Amino acid sequence: MSMVYVNISLAFTLSLMGLLMYRSHLMSSLLCLEGMMLSLFVMMSITIMSNHFTLASMAPIILLVFAACEAALGLSLLVMISNTYGTDYVQNLNLLQC
């Protein structure tokens, strides 16, 4: 495994650890999710280019489209929650409230 793959895997792992450890604010969770998607995109692109997978060359673009949709939905939820509750704390979001 080359150093590029190690660095990208480390970036994904650090983003995942950040998502698991710092989930008090919704904005930090969204940033960690974006870091995970970026590292997955780079890993897929490098793997497809190095192994000459011509049939899978659209997969990184599709992943990027899903990442953009996820970011748009996350930011719209962040705006809605901050307008409703005044903060972006995840602890305030109790799904059992009616």
Swiss-Prot record:
GO terms for biological process: ATP synthesis coupled electron transport. One of its GO terms (cellular component) is respiratory chain complex I. The chain crosses the membrane at residues 1-21, 29-49, 61-81. Its EC number is 7.1.1.2. Keywords: Electron transport, Membrane, Mitochondrion, Mitochondrion inner membrane, NAD, Respiratory chain, Translocase, Transmembrane, Transmembrane helix, Transport, Ubiquinone. It is found in: Mitochondrion inner membrane. The keyword Methyltransferase does not apply. It catalyses: a ubiquinone + NADH + 5 H(+)(in) = a ubiquinol + NAD(+) + 4 H(+)(out). It is an enzyme of class 7 (translocase). It comes from the Eukaryota. It is a multi-pass membrane protein. GO terms for molecular function: NADH dehydrogenase (ubiquinone) activity. Core subunit of respiratory chain NADH dehydrogenase (Complex I) which is composed of 45 different subunits. Core subunit of the mitochondrial membrane respiratory chain NADH dehydrogenase (Complex I) which catalyzes electron transfer from NADH through the respiratory chain, using ubiquinone as an electron acceptor. Part of the enzyme membrane arm which is embedded in the lipid bilayer and involved in proton translocation. Belongs to the complex I subunit 4L family. This is NADH-ubiquinone oxidoreductase chain 4L. The lineage of its organism: Eukaryota, Metazoa, Chordata, Craniata, Vertebrata.
